[in-house]
Amino acid sequence: MNEPTPLSRSFGYQSVDEREREQRIRRVFSAVAARYDLMNDLMSFGIHRLWKRRFVRMAAPQAGQHIVDLAGGTGDVAALMAAADRRVTVVDPSAEMMAVGQARGHAHVDWQVGSAEQLPLADASVDTLTISFGIRNATRIDVALREIHRVLKPGGRFLCLEFSTPAWWLRPFYNLFSFTVIPRLGAWIANSPEAYTYLVESIRRFPDQRGFAAMISAAGFESVRWHDLSFGIACVHVGTRAAAATPAGTA
């Protein structure tokens, strides 16, 4: 029996080398940037906006924090967390996606080009790092998780909103919609059926809730847990970087 292609060398159901995977994914987001948010509305019937608001409530942004929204794209999640009394930064490898967000004039949001596997951030410099619907596009998810752990302050929190594995009774309907409707919407709205075929296939290749939680724990995070949304169609994983140890005799 053939072993499944590692995620780092898969573009949806296709086997490619890591370099080719990175290039293809960047081309996908460059091609769909202008219609990305509209497609999300159509594909999810607008429910992704409710998921993101729930996600931001879980992130609980506070005054004085440095918050990074990784793979933040057009900045819709960052805009929900932004305020004058905190620093919110979108880090994304796609300049085209960020340009769409910058044109919208989101207040109190900074923008920085960077990849999840090599974050342009100092060690222990971030209070909260969020990522929504982006971690499965990282070529080396294990490396990305270690990088996220590196840049978080002790006690800092990582929150990831991602498509996941829905309840068994929902899967036949979910699969029918995903493989028939979504690529057609991609062709009609974004003129990019290939991009949305990749989207659907990449979701199926991504680990389920328990499997991804294990990856987060393996990267060094503590108190890892998850919360299903819409019967598991999407899921929020949360992990914490361990707080700094108190030196003996100082308590």
Curated annotation (Swiss-Prot):
Keywords: Menaquinone biosynthesis, Methyltransferase, S-adenosyl-L-methionine, Transferase, Ubiquinone biosynthesis. It is an enzyme of class 2 (transferase). This is Ubiquinone/menaquinone biosynthesis C-methyltransferase UbiE. GO terms for molecular function: 2-methoxy-6-polyprenyl-1,4-benzoquinol methyltransferase activity; demethylmenaquinone methyltransferase activity. It catalyses: a 2-demethylmenaquinol + S-adenosyl-L-methionine = a menaquinol + S-adenosyl-L-homocysteine + H(+); a 2-methoxy-6-(all-trans-polyprenyl)benzene-1,4-diol + S-adenosyl-L-methionine = a 5-methoxy-2-methyl-3-(all-trans-polyprenyl)benzene-1,4-diol + S-adenosyl-L-homocysteine + H(+). The gene is ubiE. Methyltransferase required for the conversion of demethylmenaquinol (DMKH2) to menaquinol (MKH2) and the conversion of 2-polyprenyl-6-methoxy-1,4-benzoquinol (DDMQH2) to 2-polyprenyl-3-methyl-6-methoxy-1,4-benzoquinol (DMQH2). CDD domains: AdoMet_MTases.
